[in-house]
A protein has these predicted regions:
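Structured loop/turn residues at beta-strand edges in well-structured enzyme cores
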Residues: 1, 100, 154
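N-terminal amphipathic alpha-helix/helix-capping segment at the start of soluble metabolic enzymes
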Residues: 1-10, 21, 112, 116-127
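Structured beta-strand/loop patches that form or line metal/cofactor-binding pockets in enzymes
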Residues: 1-54
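Metal- or metallocofactor-binding catalytic centers and their adjacent structured scaffolds
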Residues: 5, 37-113
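Conserved active-site and cofactor/substrate-binding residues in soluble primary-metabolism enzymes
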Residues: 29, 60, 64, 79, ...
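Broad gene-expression machinery/nucleic-acid interaction feature
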Residues: 31-33, 101, 130, 158
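Hydrophobic side chains within alpha-helical segments
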Residues: 33, 106, 111, 173-176
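Metal-dependent enolase-superfamily TIM-barrel catalytic cores that perform enediolate-based chemistry
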Residues: 120-203
Length: 203
């Protein structure tokens, strides 16, 4: 099997409300989608979600790198994951979002070729993904209200709570959410590099 065509398209979705984290505010969910087609009619889909302060990539730079990959992958065997990683690394260092999109699309092709879901291709045994939902930085009462909505109305049992812009206020945010949710609710704390090591230990 050989790769015959690679398509890259932009996807943008406005968020219901601005999403605040320690390093900034995000108002739109922007990403690139890649579709890798093969000579056997099997195709794979992948997605790149670059964020400059996380991956060092912007939407523009990510597209440029993905175009480089797209040209290099024509004629390549999509079943060769190790070779694909070596090829991408030989083209450019880092750029994890762009590489992720192609990695995902190739695994999608492999799964379809083998007639298996990707989690089994990767050696997994549990078909259920236990996901969290993220609560952005806001006033403590707003974050508490969001936590209640996600747990009691939407059924989430794992909350990822963004903090990091004010350590003293962060403690109040986390305490409020902990008190407002039932025992057994998993709370993951993500300060996005906004705390010092001492603050992290103290909180």
């Amino acid at each position: 099997m050989k790769i015959t065509k690679v398509k890259i398209e932009k996807f943008s979705a406005p968020l219901k409300e601005p999403f605040r984290v320690a390093f900034g505010v995000i108002e739109d969910a922007d990403s690139w989608t890649v579709k890798i087609e093969t000579d056997e009619g099997i195709y794979g889909l992948g997605s790149a979600a670059p964020l400059a302060f996380v991956t060092g990539e912007t939407m523009d730079t990510c597209y440029i790198v993905m175009k480089m990959f797209a040209d290099a992958f024509i004629g390549f065997d999509p079943m060769d994951i190790a070779g694909a990683h070596k090829l991408m690394d030989s083209i450019i260092y880092s750029n994890g979002a762009a590489k992720c999109a192609f990695d995902l699309a190739l695994y999608d092709i492999i799964g379809k070729k083998k007639g298996l879901p990707v989690y089994k291709v990767l050696g997994g045994t549990d078909p259920v993904v236990h996901n969290d939902i993220t609560i952005g930085i806001n006033a403590p009462e707003k974050m508490e209200a969001d936590a209640k909505e996600y747990v009691f109305e939407k059924g989430f049992r794992i909350l990822k709570v963004k903090v990091g812009n004010d350590a003293s206020l962060d403690a109040l945010r986390l305490t409020s959410i902990k008190k407002a949710t039932p025992a057994g609710t998993v709370i993951r704390v993500d300060a996005n590099q906004g705390w010092t090591p001492k603050q992290a230990v103290r909180i």
